[in-house]
Amino acid sequence: MKNICTFVARNKMKKNLKNIFARTWGLMMSTTATWEDIAEENSKENDSFLRFVLPWIAFSTFIILIFDALYAEVKFVETGFVHAFINVIALLGAYYFTLAITSSILKKNMSGIYSVIKAEKMVAYSFTVIYVLKVVAAVIPSLFFLQILDVYTVYIVWEGCRVIFNIDEDERGKIMLFISLSIIFTPMFIKRVILLMLPAF
């Protein structure tokens, strides 16, 4: 019985990892089609967070812990753990802050189409580029200039607003602006604030 449970758990984890990779790749390479798949997916509240956001935060944090420790000139272990901790706080804070902004805007201006689950999907998957670039920059710091690709988040959000909420172009522009700016800049802001409180790092 124990072996069966372990097998089922492994299969479920493997399936979830494949789904995360497929969604990540799809949103960057075939944005519209992937959003349509996400929109059709039956989800419960917090599913997008648990199945996509949390695994990505855990993975990026692990990579940052390892590589920041390896690249540190002094205080190897401390540097790795501090930067990993900052990553967790920055990404979690950015997710919940952006979700709050998205929910507030939609409730105020489009209460008829607002749904908690749809808002979670919209925000969770729109962080895709941010997560990928976090990992790339941690592994190869010299590629820091790739952060400019954060702007692709704007297109992901634009298509997400259309597919998930069926918002027309006029309204979509305003919502897209707030969501995109929050996704791109909130992690940076939180990281900067924490670093100011930790001058040794």
Name each region found by the language model.
Residues 60-61, 65, 183-189:
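Hydrophobic core of alpha-helical transmembrane segments in multi-pass integral membrane proteins
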Residues 12-114:
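Selected alpha-helical membrane-embedding segments in polytopic membrane proteins
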Residues 103-188:
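Hydrophobic alpha-helical transmembrane segments and adjacent short intramembrane/lumenal linkers
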Residues 186-201:
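Juxtamembrane boundary at the C-terminal end of a transmembrane helix
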Residues 66, 70, 139-140, 193, ...:
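Helix-loop junctions at the membrane-solvent interface of multi-pass transporters
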Residues 8-9:
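Acidic, Ala/Val/Gly-enriched low-complexity intrinsically disordered segments
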